[in-house]
Structure formats: C-alpha cells, structure tokens
Amino acid sequence: EWGATKIAVAHNSNDRSETQLFHLFRGSGIRGLASILPVRDRIIRPLLCLERWEIEKFLQQRGIVYCKDATNEEDDYTRNRIRHHILPYAEENIVKGCVAHMNQTAELLAETEDYLELQTKEAAGRCIQATDGDGESAETGDSRNAVICIAVESFLSLHPVIRKRLLYEEVKQLSPGQKDITYQHIQ
C-alpha cells in the first residue's frame, strides 16, 4: 500500500546484548553471538546503535508518548530475566558500559561471520555437488530427492571450521524448516 521496501523496527543495543547473552547461554556459535543484525532481508534496525535509556530520554525530553510491552516487565521469560537481572548486575558489578562493549563484540562477530560465510560458499563450490538422486545436477534448495555428493579429498583439506560450517549448511538444505540444528548434529 505504501510502496515501502524496508520495515524499520526499534531494536536497540540492549536488545542486542540480551540476545547475545541468551545465545551464549544456549551454546550458539559465531552466527548467534553476532546477535541482532542492523539489516536482515527487509528488516532494518536504525536504533541498534543506541541504548534503551538514550531512546527513552530522547522521547521524554520531547514529550513523545511511546508504547511499552507489559510482558517485558515480567520475569516469566528468559530474555526478561537477562534484561532485569543479569545485564544490570554486569553493568554495576562487572564492567561499566558492558552493553556498549558487547555491541562492539557483536559487530566484530558479524564481520567474522560474513567472512566465514563467504569462505564456506567458496568451499561448497569446490567440494559439494547436489544431484536429484538419479545423478542429474540439482539445486540444493530442492531437497525432496536431493543427494549431496562431497569430494572427500577437497573436503578434508579444508580447515575444520569450514568443514563444520559446510556440513551445517548442507544439513540445513536437506532439512528445510528444521529449527535448532546443533553442534551435536554436525559432530
């Protein structure tokens, strides 16, 4: 209706830190620890560089009314417990400015993830061929009868990090819609 190509959401650096800790506690890798990205598909997050208090102060100074999700105040959800207890404790007792430091780390990890993703795609081009089960070349996105052929010698010459990432991507391609493919699946 509006002809918009992007959707802007109000995630801020606190949200990013909460997500990063949540992913850390779940045992996520680099992708998860990079946390919330500033741009992902059609979603943009222009406030990711600001802390929640900075946004609220800006709005209050200008008399702008904003909405608060009441469920964010409850401790029923893991993210809220991180928000209400762990991050404030870390800020007060461990490192002042920890949210800013964690966001720096998230940015570095996002850059690292981009690089590793590129390396993984290049390695896939050298090591992986998808067939339709009859030996005919197939798109890896069509997993109904897909068979993944791995050039073993090329695969084994890869760094272990790239091998694991490559296996992860192939399992993901063969299991569309599957959530939570874990480190244990790849081992």
Predicted regions: what is each one?
Residues 1-54, 61-62, 89, 119-144:
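Active-site adenylate/phosphate-handling loop in enzymes that bind or generate adenylated species
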Residues 2, 16, 28, 50, ...:
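Residue-level signal for short amphipathic helical patches enriched in basic/charged
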Residues 17-21, 83, 186:
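Alpha-helical structural signal
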Residues 38-40, 84, 103-187:
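AMP-forming adenylation/ATP pyrophosphatase catalytic core
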Residues 45, 68-77, 151-158:
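A short glycine-threonine-serine/GTX helix/turn-capping micro-motif
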Residues 55-58, 168:
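Short glycine-/small-residue-rich flexible loop motifs, especially phosphate/cofactor-binding loops
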Residues 62-99, 104-107:
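Mid-to-C-terminal catalytic subdomains of enzymes
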